[in-house]
């Protein structure tokens, strides 16, 4: 009888079962970025919604049934009604992130057809919008150059295969063709006009309100950094096009679940009524003096340690938005005994303790923009522990 060898199952170790997603102290220059989990809620907001989350997570819920009529309904109905009131739009669709909005729109509405888009608006950053559009099955007709595109460029690109005029938010673009002009051109030729606002700052509502006032075919944006919510992509626009997207087979693969819908509902409610509960609102409305006071407090906590400590002006950055550099301060430290502990080693040891910083000119820098009082105390304790072991 032949020997049958069985593959051994690797042992389950405590480290394997430990939650990989640990709290960090973000003293880096970037706030709400992909590396650090993007958006997060304020403690007071979480306390308010915790009972609702508990209900959703520990009980069956009426996700797709109307408790008044006993009929099946769409899971988005409650949220759609709130979005329509807040934004005065015809129709709304929600998918799992903003990349999905772009892919779904291109795949469902421009399959094997041409999307005319400015070359300059597709470049920059880690997110390659061009690849997403090409993967959708649509064809791209690029116009203009790296930082300029005129209305005449779009007009000259029109042909029998044209289906959509696409615009995406790119603050670095120097010569921008207004969406209003693109929309007029699209209407003239019976094309879809679509504006991808991406991570536009919706705490200043003007950007979205101006676009929606034009009654575009479609507009999309990211929910988490736009009004500090769960990660999701929001599509708004004319009912004809949104209904086509909703009925497309791909939508089912991209739709959001009950937890995201619950978080979105309460986030939008707070965005409308209680902006002081929104983390991004609080951070963006910090005064220069308040930031300096945080830097001075951290300086005072670190000064007694075996460190060279100083305060410097700096900038913090919201997500991947190039136009969102915000004036701030940082506390710079350097071990006095660099033979035992240089900056690179200190940076790594801090990282391993969940304190994320940056290195600049042989100094480890603590950006104070997104730090709170508890974070400052924790940083001092972690540094003291590291220095004692050096």
Swiss-Prot record:
SUPFAM superfamilies: PLP-dependent transferases (SSF53383)
Record pathway: Aminoacyl-tRNA biosynthesis; selenocysteinyl-tRNA(Sec) biosynthesis; selenocysteinyl-tRNA(Sec) from L-seryl-tRNA(Sec) (bacterial route): step 1/1
Catalytic activity: L-seryl-tRNA(Sec) + selenophosphate + H(+) = L-selenocysteinyl-tRNA(Sec) + phosphate
GO terms assigned for molecular function: L-seryl-tRNA(Sec) selenium transferase activity
Modified residues (N6-(pyridoxal phosphate)lysine): 225
Requisite cofactors: pyridoxal 5'-phosphate
Entry annotated with the keyword Cytoplasm: yes
A Pfam family assignment: SelA
Chief location category: cytoplasm
Location of the protein in the cell: Cytoplasm
Family designation: Belongs to the SelA family.
HAMAP family with a match to the protein in the record: SelA
Protein name: L-seryl-tRNA(Sec) selenium transferase
Protein's gene: selA
